[in-house]
Amino acid sequence: MNTNTNTNTNISSSGNNIINTPTTNNNNKNNNNNNNNNNNSNNSNNNSSNNNNNNNNAVGVKTGKKVNLKVETPVQNNENSYSLTTSGTFKEGDLLINKKGLLIKGESPKNSSVNDRNKNKSLHSNLNPQLLASPTSSESMDFNQGFYNNNNNNNNNNNNNNLNNFNNLMNNGIDSPQLSGISISTPTSSHSFNNTFTNYYNNNNNYNNYNNNNNSNNNNNNYNNSNNNFNNFNNYNNYGNNNNFNNFNALQSSSNSSFDISSSGSSNNYLNNSANNHPHYDTNLSYDLKDLKIIRVLGRGAGGVVKLAYHETSGTYIALKVITLDIQENIRKQIILELKTLHKTSYPYIVSFYDAFYTEGSIFIALEFMELGSLSDIMKKTSTIPEPVLGKIAFQVLQGLVYLHRKLHLIHRDIKPSNILVNNKGEAKIADFGVSGQLQHTLSKAVTWVGTVTYMSPERISGRSYSFDSEIWSLGLTILECAIGKFPYGSNLPHQQQQPLQQQQQQQQQQQQPLQQQQQQQQQQQQPLQLQLQNLDINNSNNNIRNSNNNNNNNNNNNNNNNNNNNNNVLDISNGGLVDSGSSVPEGMGFWVLLDCIVKEEVPILPSTFSKEFRSFISECLQKEPTERPTASNLLNHEFVKKYQNFNVEKWTANLKQQQ
């Protein structure tokens, strides 16, 4: 019901705001008393630009009490430690070091639209990203006033003022922005939940009022669930409680909607079925260096080191990525890119991001600890991975790719064995988003050349544009390598021919010249460093490349480039940085020969000892033409994936744990 009111607002010199309101009808009185009894409207609009709008648009609250507008800034536990998730929206920019620590320079909340902020969810690490980011929901967030308002016509008028309020709070050093108006919609229903988080910006204790207001107004928003599970969402004290998150999952499963994130008309709903696999952790905890006990080093990379750390407060282990600031510019950009990606990503088959902070001259990123390590680590112990286990891993990774491609429009661009991690439960998750890229929509193409070159698709190596289908090639090559225990190219595997005539001719040549092949293999083993290449054409450029005979096995080209390629790194032609070429270059095969082989030669296939379903899966992934590769969503319907998607890997993981 609309009610015309004229509200006069006076602000005293002491900073106290007295609101005088005229008489309104009884219905509006009840609504205002139930929802605005803590007078948060006055506390939220503490700036001169809002005073004029309050005269015309403010909701009438009949009270004669003075409200203290003093803003209290939470005390930092460690003056030298700053959380990255409270420094502003993650927009295009780079690292900036100042007296406040590590900040993100670029577009700030003041200059960004509401829709841009919606994509990044809340920026406070204490807000559970899993509850705010359901794969089956479409979120809409608005940093409005700190109270629930039944008169929705006033929200539009005060929208700009509310945004200014939020910016003023952030500029004053307040860490937790207020959040209200979370709208979750599905194809069959649309519900709005108006929730306000704890408002500690004033001296009033509004916490109990906040919960009471929400509980009294959200009774109709249960998604047809038998119990009021979503009311637990409003309980701030129990925000990290596992039961609350399970209730949220039950809320999803009780919905009658069949939301398919991949494509319309598909019968698969894998994203919803796996919601219970989210890692449960208390996001109210502070991941500060003083609370972490470093156990050991898990791995090292170009930008830093990953350590196993024990969080004493929660009694949990985390993987702590430590990056020093004395690093190359391209590594700095990768750090920001990974932080932006991790912050907006929450899915069972993506490695969870807990927090990030800057202290002691380094950036610390707290991630989910995966006990069994990467697929590369596993292959070092077991040589190969059984087919049923690979089927289960493919099922899990494909779900992660569907989420990245369809939900976030994101290309990982570096799918390989070392970037797929496994925990003790046998759950495989995608990690390392340092070179990921976002496309505007599913039909977009990328043209940059970043990632591990040996796992790139032929179109990427050739310098052509690429899209999500390039990840299918990388996944197929990864699964194939795990099955045979070595990189497929140069491993004497049979190759799939596109034309039957060429296949017959090659088979005849192999039968007629077995001795010559053996001699060539012996020569390659005896003289792996003396392979001379002439007129090798890569990316339609005529480059004369030959391998020099030295102890470092460096390849020098004739383009006056003095770059040393030690079979580990190759120049990134997109931004001048280094791109890891991987450790999968077969012994005796030059790096450029390998790339030429991937582009020009036929693709490898699985031996006949594997099942026909597995061989078909690899064959469909390793199609030279991108348009002939199935999408990640389509591959979830493949017979190989369906065959092993429910396979129990506990016995396999138990054997691996014994070998550690």
Curated annotation (Swiss-Prot):
Q: Where is this cross-link: Glycyl lysine isopeptide (Lys-Gly) (interchain with G-Cter in SUMO)?
A: K105
Q: Pinpoint the Protein kinase domain residues.
A: 292-641
| SMART domains (UniProt xref) | S_TKc
Record-annotated active site: D414
InterPro entries in the record, alphabetically? Kinase-like_dom_sf, Prot_kinase_dom, Protein_kinase_ATP_BS, Ser/Thr_kinase_AS
* Family assignment from sequence similarity: Belongs to the protein kinase superfamily. STE Ser/Thr protein kinase family. MAP kinase kinase subfamily.
Q: What's this protein's name?
A: Dual specificity mitogen-activated protein kinase kinase 1
Query: What organism is this sequence from?
Result: Dictyostelium discoideum
Phylogenetic placement of the source organism: Eukaryota, Amoebozoa, Evosea, Eumycetozoa, Dictyostelia
Q: Which gene encodes it?
A: mekA
